[in-house]
Amino acid sequence: MLFRSPIVRFFSRILNRITITVVLVALQLLWLCWVAFAITTGTGRVWVNGLLNALSLLIVLYLVRKDENSAYKVGWIALIGILPLLGGALYLAFGNKRPSRRLRSKMQAVEQAHRTDRAQQPGQTAGLCDENRGVSRYLTQYGCYPAWQNTTARYFSCGEAMYPALLADLEKAEKSIFLEFFIVSQGKMWQGVEDILRRKAAQGVDVRLIYDDFGSLLGLPKDFVVRMERAHIRCIPFNPVVPLLSLVMNHRDHRKIVVIDGKVAYTGGINLADEYINAITRFGYWKDAGLRIEGAAAWNFTVMFLDFWNAFRPFEQGYSAFRPQLAVLPASDGVVQPYADSPLDEEPVAETVYLDILAQAQQYVYFYTPYLAIGEEMLDALR
């Protein structure tokens, strides 16, 4: 084993990628503040101050008229009120929630090319009551994902309950394994998954991984992508973190998806990190929920993953190769409709679904979330 002195270990710890990024971004912010101060206090400052104030006023008027979450608008308006000279410029730099024009163009092209893969099959919603059928139509129209019968769902109340089932399903993979996560971090949980992925890739299974670069920044080595590609695991780090101020640096991929052979899918709030299975302790007991879907509705997750994958890699000629022929369909007494929200429009699909659930509730509604940050509309509905 290579011995490293305490000094070497110290500098290795402080000179990691995230520390360097934070320091460089902070220096850029300080430089911009100095430039702004120099401009607004030097020759021509009256004109510059007037232009910046006018910009801030226009941004406030735009936010007031914008169809947007009220808490989000109030936050920005308050910031602009506190910093009238810089508030408008800060909104232009960091307030845009839509993806870059290039990524938006690619995502739109992918969605158009594979729209038929989201077509609603006839008869799938026949057993729904009128209220639920309305929600289903809304999800089909705005979420662009169909509803399915012949699907079973299993709920896991915590990560350590879901983990063994996930490993067992990964071991059964014969054709494809698709994974998409916000956090992937080296440790017991990831090692168990990685061992299976490497073995399956060596057997010829199509294994692909998308992970958020910021969410996984502290948990993965620098050469992670190279190591995965060498093992024939195709890999995409979403929105790589760079030590430069960027208009899209806060655009992150928080989805947690696993799709196995197009037959079984996992989703929920559980990332691939040890705290999610309580193998380590961070902030006490870590409780996130998971969901296992088996049957026809797993197809929606396949389309979600491939749509996003194709925005960064060359188009798949068709998704039909990943659509399983289910000889025996699981029996079920309900309808399952997995859906994804889109950054390409202003429609708050997920929030609208929750509001509709609350509006229809007659006796009780159970919500579970480890993070509670809701806007006024949701608070009003809960009251």
Residue map of PLM features:
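Active-site metal-binding loops of divalent metal-dependent hydrolases
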Residues: 270, 370-371
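N-terminal localization/anchoring segments of enzymes in phospholipid and broader phosphate metabolism
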Residues: 1-356, 360
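Helical hairpin unit composed of two closely spaced alpha helices linked by a short loop
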Residues: 371-383
